[in-house]
Amino acid sequence: MRTRLTDRTRRLAAALGATACVIALASCSTESSPESSSPTSSAAPSESGAGTYLALGDSVPFGFRGGATADFSDAANFVGYPELVGEELDLDVVNASCPGETTASFMDTKAQSNGCDNSLQSGFGYRTAYPLHVLYESMDQSQLDFAVDTLTENEDVELVTLQIGANDAFICQQTTPTRCSDPADLQALAQTVQTNIDTILSTLRDEAGYDGQIVVVTYYALNYSDAFGAATQEIGDGIEQVAEANGADVADGYEAFRARAAEVGGDSVEAGLVLPNDVHPSDEGQRLLAEAVLAVAED
C-alpha cells in the first residue's frame, strides 16, 4: 500500500478552473473541433507491459482548469490525480473522465449534464467542442459504455476509480428555489446520486465482469464550516455505503482536505486546496486526492 508521492509526481499536478469558465470561453472560441488534438490515451491494451488504470468521472479526475490561459484544444494540458496515481503505481492511465458529467449523463449522453454533453444555460457540451483524454467511439457512447467496453476488451486493468456526483449537486442548485438547501431537495439529490452510482458499479461488476479493484472517490467540501459542507459529507457517506455494497473501496476525499481546511476556519480555498473563486482543486488539492487513492490502492 503506497501512501506517499514522489517529488517528480508532485510536479505533474495542475491547477483546475471553474466549469462555467470553459462554457463561456467555448461559446466564443474558434478552436472548437474535437479532432484538433489526438487523445493522450485510449482503450487499447497497455503497450508498455504495465497494467492499466481506468479513471472515470467528471472534471476533477479529468484535470480540468479554466481561464484565458487554458488550451482546451489539447487534452494533454489537463492533468488530474489519476495521472499522479498512475505514475506512482506504474500503471498506464486511461482517463475517460468528462468535465460536467453527472451520474445520469455518465450512463446516458442525452441525460442532463453540467457541461459534458449539454448544459442548462446553453446546451454546450465539452466533449462536442474539445477532445477528452480518450477517443470515444461516437458522441452517443456514454462514459459507462466506454468503461464496459474497456473492461471487457482488456484483461490488464488493475485499478478503476470513479468520482461522480458533484455536478448533480450543481444542477440541483441551479434548478431548485432554495438552491438545494431545502432538506427535501438534499434528500432527493442524495437518493439520485446513490441510485445511479449503484447502477454504475453493478454494471461494471456484472455486465463488464470486472472483479478487480474499484475505488470510489468522495468529494471534499468547499467550506467545512457551512451547511453545504455538511451536506457534502452526508452525500459522501451514502456513496460510501453504495460502494461497499458493490465490493468497491473508498478514497475519502472529504477527509483528505478537512484537517488543512480546519487550520483556516474550514475554507478549502483559503487553505490553498481549491482555486480562488472556483470549485476545483489546486495542485496541492490534486496531490491530496491522489494520496487518498493511494492509501487504499492494492499493491
Language-model-detected regions and their locations in the chain:
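Bacterial N-terminal signal peptides that target proteins for export
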Residues: 2-16
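C-terminal motif of bacterial Sec signal peptides marking the signal peptidase cleavage site
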Residues: 23-27
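Bacterial lipoprotein signal-peptidase II cleavage site
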Residues: 28-38
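Serine-esterase "nucleophile elbow" of acetyl-processing enzymes
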Residues: 40-118
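Structural recognition of the beta-strand scaffold that forms the well-ordered cores
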Residues: 52-57, 61-63, 92-97, 158-163, ...
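Oxyanion-hole/transition-state-stabilizing segment in secreted/luminal serine hydrolases
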Residues: 62-66, 115-187
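Active-site segments of SGNH/GDSL-like serine hydrolases
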Residues: 163-168, 177, 200-233
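Catalytic His-Asp segment of secreted/periplasmic serine-dependent ester chemistry enzymes
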Residues: 219-299
